[in-house]
Amino acid sequence: MAARPLPVSPARALLLALAGALLAPCEARGVSLWNQGRADEVVSASVGSGDLWIPVKSFDSKNHPEVLNIRLQRESKELIINLERNEGLIASSFTETHYLQDGTDVSLARNYTVILGHCYYHGHVRGYSDSAVSLSTCSGLRGLIVFENESYVLEPMKSATNRYKLFPAKKLKSVRGSCGSHHNTPNLAAKNVFPPPSQTWARRHKRETLKATKYVELVIVADNREFQRQGKDLEKVKQRLIEIANHVDKFYRPLNIRIVLVGVEVWNDMDKCSVSQDPFTSLHEFLDWRKMKLLPRKSHDNAQLVSGVYFQGTTIGMAPIMSMCTADQSGGIVMDHSDNPLGAAVTLAHELGHNFGMNHDTLDRGCSCQMAVEKGGCIMNASTGYPFPMVFSSCSRKDLETSLEKGMGVCLFNLPEVRESFGGQKCGNRFVEEGEECDCGEPEECMNRCCNATTCTLKPDAVCAHGLCCEDCQLKPAGTACRDSSNSCDLPEFCTGASPHCPANVYLHDGHSCQDVDGYCYNGICQTHEQQCVTLWGPGAKPAPGICFERVNSAGDPYGNCGKVSKSSFAKCEMRDAKCGKIQCQGGASRPVIGTNAVSIETNIPLQQGGRILCRGTHVYLGDDMPDPGLVLAGTKCADGKICLNRQCQNISVFGVHECAMQCHGRGVCNNRKNCHCEAHWAPPFCDKFGFGGSTDSGPIRQADNQGLTIGILVTILCLLAAGFVVYLKRKTLIRLLFTNKKTTIEKLRCVRPSRPPRGFQPCQAHLGHLGKGLMRKPPDSYPPKDNPRRLLQCQNVDISRPLNGLNVPQPQSTQRVLPPLHRAPRAPSVPARPLPAKPALRQAQGTCKPNPPQKPLPADPLARTTRLTHALARTPGQWETGLRLAPLRPAPQYPHQVPRSTHTAYIK
């Protein structure tokens, strides 16, 4: 298929397509016209858009536009390339470092490099959806163009200002090299290292880690030999290193990984560590220098050395596998084997893949690659050359997923600080810079409903637009888990309630005991001999007895050693360090399960008491770019309180974990930043006060507490509502019980007449009058004392049961008459609860019983009460209804009419 022509009408385009299919079979098969010539294509370049195109003569070193359209044209063929400046490539903390003659380092901040301008672009070929472009305009147009499954290199011609060479990448001058590993070693350091998590957590963590963008804060170092090969031009070397990073960033974008360059360093005076043709020695020397010198002065995740030294054999790079984010192994070395920076970029991407846990793509793995082998294949091929690979295979993606799920790359989830992108601030570059509330890209590509793509501001009612702690344009509550722990040595992170971003990943301090595993944490991973045996030999494998480690690893040969001294010599293990050399196992599969080039090394050791012990080791025919997978991994427990470090069994006290844990008062653990991660209900930083748990690094643990508090409040509210509803329904009954039935002290002592007399009720005025007369005729000495009014009222309760009939009761002579004082009578028992008998004799007998005294004293004026009683007796029936009511609560006894009144007198005793 030819390059897309200038825009034409749809009908004409259809006719041209049909004619092309009939007359140009080779083009119909997808073979580009740009690839049919044997010699390099010489093209002219121009910039512009539409019908206005200006020839490219040179670019101003200080002015590189944010968006650039380039047209490459030769005769009737043309390519239009749409480019955007790769704003996220260089962090705001980016520094350039070189050295003076006396060895003093000079670090220049971003404000210096902005003078040179940001001249690194990513883009695509117009009309080709699967195309990819990575170019630099620092010194003319230079870079990589991929379309129609072909890779092309664009380079400026020395003899012309706007003439360029465009040729297939397979013609690029390069030294064909090999990573040297021809076996499949999937997940050597990762597979089965941890107990399998629950399926729910595995699915959730997989979605989170794969969906979230990972950021590798990278430092690239050029050794002295590279500086010399580039003509000792310091600026040229720096631009070359940044261009390499620009290509690598393009390679890793499909994996949702961004390469953020935080620094470049050039050893222009001398090498800062030993760099020789032995790649193994050079790698370890560089990693030691990074740990001791570079890390303390420059924070970063990974460092790569680009060397101008030609390594021995076919090795063009080397890196430890699954070592990303570690302090001692997160790095690699790369040989700059091509005139074009693309060659070193492909090798650096390969070695960085090893750091990510990716293994080589081999035939027995059945990997799927979008690019055919003759067109370059995939980046993790064991052997690389030309054409250069540009994509990752399905195996690489799977290895990366497995490594992330195992806890690798704990440092990759924090967004690097970006106050202002290198080269200037721009709305639409997907980086939230100073003064911006959000940035979702250009308006035509923005899919974020919380962000205004035109102004990079939040929409109305939106609080946030990006981040794991932002949901539906609102901040998640404090204590919401945003990143769970991935293994027994990892710590969870929680939203703070104030930021849309999840806190940076933290893990247990090195030397901390693993949870539920007999081992110690190291770089956020729990390593044990048993897990490594399962990795090498499959399920059922276990570590061999200690005598196997001691006998085999004391040999100092390829099958038993404590690491390499050089490329061809091995170190013997001391007795105390034997469990830090080649791992020895028992059981498992009949042969190693890590790859086709791994063989079993079996050793029989006789015992003094008879018999033999079978020790099984592993030897892998490696290249030179990867360490021996049969060696015990760093951080593995080798004795109680000791772990393997640098092939030596060392005490965990070297990490200072106990001193760090003491400040947590036994209510928390120490994380890798030497801060306390407190239990729930205890507050950081020292877990000595009540709080919400967590740490100053990972946010508060409040999710469970919030749920409990919310549930408690809801239950309380529901109970109150239910109680209020019941009260409302029973309000009349409650009011009657609480208010209408209450009596005062005096009212409780009074006899209240029933409001409605029972059936058959007879007025009792006659009886009351009869009794009243008797009382009048009673001798004075028979009455109770004047100062004791209780007898009168109690006797009234006993005998005066009903009002008297006013017709039969004679009216008293005077209402002012006062009854004579009553003498104290003998105490009588309580009044019977049933009516008195009809016979007078029985009534008289019952009168001898003395009733119980009242529970509360009567008022202090009995005389006045007696007077009122007399007045009440003299009232008429009409007056009686409204007067003082002295009727008892029980019905009055029925007296027979035939009882003579003259012969009976009721005595009140």
Swiss-Prot record:
Extracellular topological segments: 208-708
Binding site for Zn(2+): C179, H350, H354, H360
PTM remark: The precursor is cleaved by a furin endopeptidase.
Transmembrane segments: 709-729
GO MF terms held by the record: metal ion binding; metalloendopeptidase activity; metallopeptidase activity; SH3 domain binding
Cytoplasmic side stretches: 730-909
Domain Disintegrin as annotated: residue spans: 424-510
Modified residues (Phosphotyrosine): Y907
Any Gene Ontology biological process: myoblast fusion
Phenotypic consequence of G479E: In a breast cancer sample; somatic mutation
Active site per UniProt: E351
Tissues and organs where the protein is expressed, per its UniProt entry: Isoform 1 is expressed in placenta and skeletal, cardiac, and smooth muscle. Isoform 2 seems to be expressed only in placenta or in embryo and fetus. Both forms were expressed in some tumor cells lines. Not detected in brain, lung, liver, kidney or pancreas.
Residue ranges of the motif SH3-binding: 828-834, 834-841, 885-891
Domain EGF-like: 656-688
Notes concerning its domains: The cysteine-rich domain supports cell adhesion through syndecans and triggers signaling events that lead to beta-1 integrin-dependent cell spreading. In carcinomas cells the binding of this domain to syndecans does not allow the integrin-mediated cell spreading. The conserved cysteine present in the cysteine-switch motif binds the catalytic zinc ion, thus inhibiting the enzyme. The dissociation of the cysteine from the zinc ion upon the activation-peptide release activates the enzyme.
Subunit record text: Interacts with alpha-actinin-2 and with syndecans. Interacts with SH3PXD2A. Interacts with FST3. Interacts with RACK1; the interaction is required for PKC-dependent translocation of ADAM12 to the cell membrane.
Name of the molecule in the record: Disintegrin and metalloproteinase domain-containing protein 12
Gene source species: Homo sapiens (Human)
Name of the gene: ADAM12
